[in-house]
Amino acid sequence: MYNVPSRTGCNILPETAVKLAKEVDNIVAIKAATGNLSQESKTMMLAEGCLDMYSGEDGLIVPLMSIGAKGVISVLSNVAPKQTHDICAEFFAGNVEKSRQLQFEALELVDALFCEVNPIPVKTALNLMGMEVGPLRMPLCEMEEANLNKLKTALKNYGLLK
C-alpha cells in the first residue's frame, strides 16, 4: 500500500492502514510518504507486526527506520544507489550515528530531486551523470533554469557530477 497524500489527495489514516492489513492477505507493507512522523509512529504502534513500513520520503529514511521502518522505496536510490544503501545498512548494523550523518549529507540532493515534479529531476540528473535514460515525455517539460542549477550544484556537492 502506498500512502502519498501529496499526490493522491487522500491520506490513509493509521487505523485504516492497519485494518486493511488485517483484512486483506496480500497487504503486507506500507510505503509511508506523508512526511508526518507522528502519523507514521501511530501506524507502527497500531500495526503490532501485521504491517511492515518502508520510507517513501528520502529525507526521512533514518527517522522512519528509528520507529520501525524496514528500509526505503526511494527516488534518491535511482541517482545514488550505493549511498542510499549505505544509509540503511549502517542503521541496521547499529551504526545509527553514521547512518544519520549519511542522511544529512544526502539532504541537499534530496531537496533538489524534489524541486519539481517527479520524474523530471531524477531523469535530468541521470542524463547529466551520463546515463542515457532518454528525454522527458509530454506532459513533462524541462526543468526551470534555477532548479536545474540547484540540481547540478547538489550533484556536484554530493560527488556525482564534475
List where the protein language model places each region:
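Glycine/proline-rich, positively charged
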Residues: 1-52
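Alpha-helix N-cap/helix-start capping motif
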Residues: 24, 34-37, 58, 77-81
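Structured C-terminal cap/extension of enzyme domains
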Residues: 59-162
